[in-house]
Amino acid sequence: KTMTQKNLALVTGANGHLGNNVVRLLIDKGVRASVRTIKNKEPFAGLNCDVVQADITDKQSLINALQGVDVFYAVGAAFKLWAKDPKKEIYDVNLEGIKNTIEAAVEAGVRRIVYVSSIAATEFTKLPIKESNGYNTDRRDMYFNAKNDGEKLAFELAQKHNIELVAVLPSAMIGSEAFAPLNVSYSVINLILKKQIPVETGITLNWIDVKDVAEGCYLAATKGRNGERYILANETCMPIKDTTRIAQELYPELAIK
């Protein structure tokens, strides 16, 4: 089928939790979904969109997927929280992926990129957390470092190549539609359910509905100011204790203690 090029969007990581919800939101607006491997069709069942193969580690595959695209939702990332060699498997892969992402968008003539960063890329020792606080100064964690430096690199390259870029920084996303493998938020929930994280810990999490984040991505594309970063999060955080209590009420069959 032909799509009007004018409003064609590409969503990378389109089988992931956020990517798939962005695709669903854009389905009436002209969208192409890209995934690293096309084997699993389940996330796209009944959806009227082109599904193409692209990998952030392969720039040419991105250039091909971006032909005729106006807005590029860069959702796909090679994210793990844990790795044998975090510098190589988490940090290097993602920074290389960001370089490929921006350069491919420039070569393909994309107008605007919505870059999905993370709340982990903010300075959260100063409360309340605001975009203007700057970046996280704690350098102990490769996941945080990759998110911080990745977002900075995205803005630097966008400026250098004169392409519009808006960053969104979601907190811990939950909600449907979700397909396996599940994201980091769900891994945390799973660890709690399996009693591998003690519920009495003082850890608080900032939950947000993935559909609200998808909507925030769309607003960043249509109304966001070029060069800005926008936090997409809840106004309040919730202790794990309260999260568990709500889960007990909603899903008594899980027998969460």
Regions found by a protein language model. Name each.
Residues N7-K29:
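N-terminal Rossmann NAD(P)H-binding glycine-rich loop of SDR-like oxidoreductase domains
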Residues I38-E96:
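NAD(P)H-binding glycine-rich loop region in Rossmannoid oxidoreductase-like domains
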Residues A74, A78, K84-Y143:
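Conserved Rossmann-fold NAD(P)-dependent oxidoreductase catalytic core, especially the SDR/UDP-sugar
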Residues S117, G150-S176:
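Conserved beta-loop-beta element that borders a ligand/cofactor-binding pocket
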Residues N136-T137, A180, S187-I208, D212:
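A conserved pocket-lining segment of Rossmann-fold NAD(P)-dependent short-chain dehydrogenase/reductase
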Residues A146:
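Active-site helix of classical SDR
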Residues K160-E164, G175-V188, A220-Y230:
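Glycine/proline-rich active-site loop of Rossmann-fold NAD(P)-dependent oxidoreductases
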Residues T204, A214-K257:
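Mid/C-terminal beta-alpha module of Rossmann-like enzyme folds, strongest
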